[in-house]
């Protein structure tokens, strides 16, 4: 399979900060998935690093567009750290376009992207990359174990979806953007790209174990299809 993994920055770079052993744990899982015969591409979010730089930028009077650029640079730093851990399985350059990522993939290596354009989340980048390279599966690794109707970290009665359509995902993202206190695992732009491209998506808890499970066809999360 050709698989795009979308890793939230908070998954790879948690609040307590980056740890080399944790990064290597993820790298080893991706190496294993590739060794099993899959083609692997990765998009990494900015996490704590991006949030801190964006906050400082705003305090210093930077425009939102400039803060977006700070966030993009942070995602690329995270991508470069993962590339370093991947060693010969990747190329020591963060691709900044889908064409470049596909070229690396076609060379038998693992491309690791960060952000690309101001205003676009790395979720949207991952969905666009999956569409561009005609991926068989987009895996979204988050800090929760699937898509819920509201934030399960805040609401005990949050309902998890085992399966849903892309249109249902879009509707949920719209609803979440309008309701105070609500949040969607997948943002609206990414959801619309998923719907447009008719992508098959698995939303799972972004642990190394669950990412490996997905490559084996075991999805302990939400499947989005159709």
From Swiss-Prot:
GO cellular component: cytoplasm
SUPFAM superfamilies the UniProt entry points to: Carbamate kinase-like
Residue numbers binding UMP: 46, 68, 116-122
EC number annotated for this UniProt entry: 2.7.4.22
Pathway it works in: Pyrimidine metabolism; CTP biosynthesis via de novo pathway; UDP from UMP (UMPK route): step 1/1
One BP annotation, GO: UDP biosynthetic process
Transferase listed as a keyword: yes
Localization terms from the record: Cytoplasm
Activity regulation note: Inhibited by UTP.
Pfam families, per the entry: AA_kinase (PF00696)
Keywords: ATP-binding, Cytoplasm, Kinase, Nucleotide-binding, Pyrimidine biosynthesis, Transferase
InterPro entries, sorted: AceGlu_kinase-like_sf, Asp/Glu/Uridylate_kinase, Glu/AcGlu_kinase, Uridylate_kinase, Uridylate_kinase_arch/spir
Principal cellular location given in the protein's record: cytoplasm
Record has Kinase as a keyword: yes
Catalytic activity: UMP + ATP = UDP + ADP
Residues that, per the record, bind ATP: 9-10, 47, 51, 142-143, 148, 151
GO molecular function terms attached to this record: ATP binding; UMP kinase activity
Protein family membership: Belongs to the UMP kinase family.
Function, in words: Catalyzes the reversible phosphorylation of UMP to UDP.
Complex formation: Homohexamer.
HAMAP family listed in its UniProt record: PyrH_A (MF_01220_A)
Full protein name: Uridylate kinase
């Amino acid at each position: 399979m050709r698989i795009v993994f979308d890793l939230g920055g908070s998954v790879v770079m948690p609040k307590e900060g980056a740890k080399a052993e944790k990064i290597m744990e993820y790298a080893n899982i991706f190496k294993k998935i590739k060794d099993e015969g899959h083609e692997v591409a990765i998009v990494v979010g900015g996490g704590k690093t991006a949030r801190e730089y964006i906050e400082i930028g705003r305090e210093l009077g930077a425009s939102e567009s400039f803060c977006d650029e700070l966030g993009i640079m942070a995602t690329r730093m995270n991508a470069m750290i993962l590339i370093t851990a991947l060693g010969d399985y990747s190329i020591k350059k963060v691709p900044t376009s889908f064409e470049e990522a596909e070229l690396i993939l076609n060379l038998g290596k693992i491309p690791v992207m960060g952000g690309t354009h101001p205003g676009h989340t790395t979720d949207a980048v991952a969905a666009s990359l999956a569409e561009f390279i005609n991926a068989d599966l987009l895996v979204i690794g988050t800090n929760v174990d699937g898509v819920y109707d509201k934030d399960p970290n805040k609401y005990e009665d949050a309902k998890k979806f085992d399966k849903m359509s892309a249109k249902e995902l879009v509707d949920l993202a719209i609803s979440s953007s309008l309701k105070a206190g609500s949040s969607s695992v997948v943002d609206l732009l990414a959801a619309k790209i998923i719907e447009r491209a008719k992508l098959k998506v698995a939303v799972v808890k972004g642990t190394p174990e669950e990412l490996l499970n997905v490559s084996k066809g075991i999805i302990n999360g939400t499947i989005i299809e159709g």
